[in-house]
Structure formats: structure tokens, C-alpha cells
A protein has these predicted regions:
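Generic structural signal for individual residues within well-ordered alpha-helical segments
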Residues: 11-14, 55, 157
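Helix-loop segments that flank and shape redox-cofactor active sites
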Residues: 1-9, 67-74
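Structured surface interface patches that mediate subunit assembly and partner/cofactor docking
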Residues: 29-33, 70-184
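Short, structural beta-strand-to-alpha-helix junction motif
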Residues: 9-10, 50, 152
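Active-site-proximal cofactor/substrate-binding loop regions of enzyme domains
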Residues: 5-25
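Short, helix-capping/interhelical loops that line the mouth of catalytic, cofactor-
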Residues: 19-68, 96
Length: 184
């Protein structure tokens, strides 16, 4: 099981990712695509597949989705960020180091800042222990004083993706963790 996606196994996360990436590659965006119900259907469709088939689909999706996402002008960036977060879910479930960090972190933080601004999320000023510059997230409208986060980048990613933060050391003032989740 994975902590980041309750009720899902690591295989389920990989099956979801492979399906989501192939939807992007094939431009299959029916109503409700990427909803929890659609995700569960996609996982169920792959239940009888071998692990090798799921991994093959994931590899194809990872290879072919990048150019499609890049050409979409930002419209698929939330899906790209979600796939990166799911990589962290898998590493976390397997006890591997580097869950929600690694070489992709600077890109993920850039996407997170832009996506939260475009979605009109609550404003937040993040002082990250492991990043030199502070990060401004959300939309600064003047209606709400920006919340403040002090902690590491991995925990910030966990907060914005609705992942568990129990046992993590951080400070969050002016907002509740549940207000930050951009995926549900």
C-alpha cells in the first residue's frame, strides 16, 4: 500500500500513471478524465495485465507524453506535476530515499508556484530549508494575508499534493494543510 494514495498499491499507482500518460499521448480527454472515478476505472482495466505490460505502457507514456505536454502551453502541467508526485509516492512506499525531491524538484516547484497562482489558490510564502530563495505560491489578491510555511521542499510538495505529513518538521501559519491540496 501507499501512504500518498490510500487504498492503492504501488502497482495501482504505476497503472494509474501509465494510463494517464497514455491518455495524454492519445489525446483522450473525455468528461471526468483524471477524476478519482476515472482513475479507479483505469486501474481496474489493468488489473489482469502482467506487471511487464503495465511497465511497458508506463515507459511508452513517459517517452511519448513529454513532447505532448510541452506543446500544450501549460494546459497539461498539472498532470505532469501529478506524475512527478506519484514518482515520490512510489519511492516513499518502497522506502527509497528522495521521495518528493531529486533532480526534478526545481521544475516541480516552478510548476507548483505557477499552477497555484493560476488556480487562484490561497497565497503562501514558503521559506524552504533546502532551497536558497523563498517561494511565493498562490494568488496574491489582497483579500487574504499570505500564509507562511517554513520547512523542507519535500514536505511542501506533500502538503500541496495531499500527502501525509505526520512526523515531518515544519511550520504552517495562516492556513490549514487541507487548504493547500491542489489535486482534489
Amino acid at each position: 500500500p501507499t501512504d500518498g494514495c490510500p487504498g492503492w498499491t504501488v502497482r495501482d499507482v504505476v497503472a494509474h500513471c501509465s494510463s494517464a500518460l497514455m491518455r495524454i499521448v492519445e489525446s483522450r480527454y473525455e468528461k471526468g478524465v483524471f477524476s478519482p472515478e476515472a482513475n479507479d476505472r483505469d486501474i481496474a482495466e489493468r488489473a489482469e495485465w502482467t506487471n511487464a505490460q503495465v511497465v511497458d505502457e508506463l515507459e511508452r507514456g513517459m517517452t511519448e507524453a513529454g513532447p505532448v505536454i510541452a506543446k500544450a502551453g501549460g494546459a497539461l502541467d498539472l498532470a505532469a506535476l501529478g506524475e512527478w508526485v506519484h514518482g515520490g509516492d512510489v519511492r516513499d512506499a518502497l522506502g527509497e530515499p528522495g521521495a518528493y525531491i531529486g533532480p526534478g524538484l526545481p521544475h516541480a516547484l516552478t510548476l507548483l508556484a505557477r499552477i497555484t497562482r493560476e488556480k487562484g489558490c490561497l497565497p503562501l510564502h514558503a521559506d524552504l530549508d533546502d532551497v536558497d530563495e523563498p517561494l511565493t505560491l498562490g494568488a496574491v489578491s489582497g483579500e487574504r494575508t499570505p500564509a507562511r510555511y517554513i520547512g523542507d521542499a519535500a514536505t511542501l510538495v506533500r502538503l500541496y499534493s495531499g500527502r501525509p505529513v505526520a512526523g515531518r518538521t515544519f511550520e504552517l501559519a495562516g492556513a490549514e494543510a487541507k487548504e493547500l491540496n491542489i489535486f482534489w
